[in-house]
Amino acid sequence: MKLPIYLDYAATTPVDPRVAEKMFQCMTMDGIFGNPASRSHRYGWQAEEAVDIARNQIAELINADHREIVFTSGATESNNLAIKGVAHFYHKKGKHIITSKTEHKAVLDTCRQLEREGFEVTYLEPAANGIIPMERLEAAMRDDTILVSIMHVNNEIGVIHDIDAIGELCRSKGIIFHMDAAQSAGKVPIDVQATQVDLLSISGHKMYGPKGIGALYVRRKPRIRLEAQMHGGGHERGMRSGTLPTHQIVGLGEAAAIAKAEMASDDARIGALRDKLWNGIKHIEETYINGDAIERVSGSLNVSFNYVEGESLMMALKDLAVSSGSACTSASLEPSYVLRALGLNDEMAHSSIRFSIGRFTTEEEIDHAIEVITQSIDKLREMSPLWEMFKDGIDLNQVQWAHH
């Protein structure tokens, strides 16, 4: 068993060897290395065909038309293109946008930039289970609302939003609906024909594809218009200029095809491992699951261990590659803004760990993880004066701490 055990699949996934193999065939002189935009020779035609196949594979994963897939450098760019693209194109219709406080930074910071440009953004508060209540969303809608951006699956707590209901509500009000599907594409079934989602962001490296590639689904009927954010040769029907990276796109396509074929079996196996992990640690006193216990993606488990300091817990769990929030913000010692939005206090938010399980996780690794977690919590609490006070029946909320 290789240590540390990788339990951070929500941060990134390893490239599936079958994907890597396909990618390598598009890189060297004896492979499909041409520029897909080179229309005058065979090297370009072959590359264009490889890109077309991948575009179809991604479209099939979400039941879209291949002409609705725009390649980007990843979900961050897809989110930027969707949100800024809509805001800049439809600004005469209205300048109000709705999102939630628990979105990924790629959505929140894009919205903050638009606020600097004169747009108004409403940041919805989730319920305690991490899900945005529909009545809260509807109450925030106005005549000048042009866009709602709500993620499908949360990257920190793994809860799943009811996108059918959100899509239906937005369509009935004539509001464009963007969904960040970085954590759900390839893991949860998505059917854009059945769901009234207008824009959908996809990331390659969250579903066993390469980093640096993603896609944005842009609905054709009813047609959604975007203002390009990247200008140049007019690639991707003018929505995203830049030479298409054939090997990256082929990797994303293959990852999508594998995900579609193996989604049900992956989901069942990963879900069983997640349940095994939770059942192995839930007996530990003062241990709480964050986010909805039912409406969640199979590989995600965010747990707070009360009276244990987050950073010391991370160090104690050195045999496990886990995180205390999203990878994008884990360098900061601030408590997770997602958990704070759920109503957790700073101490509970600080003592939380995100375990995310994936395609290559084994049962043996989960058994070892349970052992490591149990021993580490026991050891840290033995050294904790707060734990001792709690065990003595002292209500720590009533303690008046002296400031020196």
Swiss-Prot record:
Q: Which family does it belong to?
A: Belongs to the class-V pyridoxal-phosphate-dependent aminotransferase family. NifS/IscS subfamily.
Tell me the superkingdom of the source: Bacteria
As for what it does, the entry says: Master enzyme that delivers sulfur to a number of partners involved in Fe-S cluster assembly, tRNA modification or cofactor biosynthesis. Catalyzes the removal of elemental sulfur atoms from cysteine to produce alanine. Functions as a sulfur delivery protein for Fe-S cluster synthesis onto IscU, an Fe-S scaffold assembly protein, as well as other S acceptor proteins.
Return the HAMAP family for the record. Answer: Cys_desulf_IscS
Entry-linked InterPro entries: Aminotrans_V_dom, Aminotrans_V_PyrdxlP_BS, Cys_deSase_IscS, Cysteine_dSase, PyrdxlP-dep_Trfase, PyrdxlP-dep_Trfase_major, PyrdxlP-dep_Trfase_small
Q: Assembly and partners?
A: Homodimer. Forms a heterotetramer with IscU, interacts with other sulfur acceptors.
Hey, which pathway is this one from? Cofactor biosynthesis; iron-sulfur cluster biosynthesis
| Top EC class for this record | transferase
Q: Which NCBIfam families match?
A: IscS, PRK02948.1, PRK14012.1
Tell where it localizes. Answer: Cytoplasm
Q: Where are the transmembrane segments?
A: none
Quickly give the catalysed reaction.
(sulfur carrier)-H + L-cysteine = (sulfur carrier)-SH + L-alanine
UniProt cross-references to PANTHER family, sorted A to Z: CYSTEINE DESULFURASE, CYSTEINE DESULFURYLASE FAMILY MEMBER
Q: Which UniProt keywords apply?
A: 2Fe-2S, Cytoplasm, Iron, Iron-sulfur, Metal-binding, Pyridoxal phosphate, Transferase
- GO CC annotation terms, alphabetical: L-cysteine desulfurase complex
* Name this polypeptide is given: Cysteine desulfurase IscS
Residues binding pyridoxal 5'-phosphate are 75-76, 155, 183, 203-205, 243
* Single GO biological process annotation from the record: [2Fe-2S] cluster assembly
Cofactor(s) needed:
pyridoxal 5'-phosphate
Q: Which residues carry this modification: N6-(pyridoxal phosphate)lysine?
A: 206
Q: Which organism is it from?
A: Shewanella baltica (strain OS223)
Q: Gene name on record?
A: iscS
- Chain residues that bind [2Fe-2S] cluster: 328
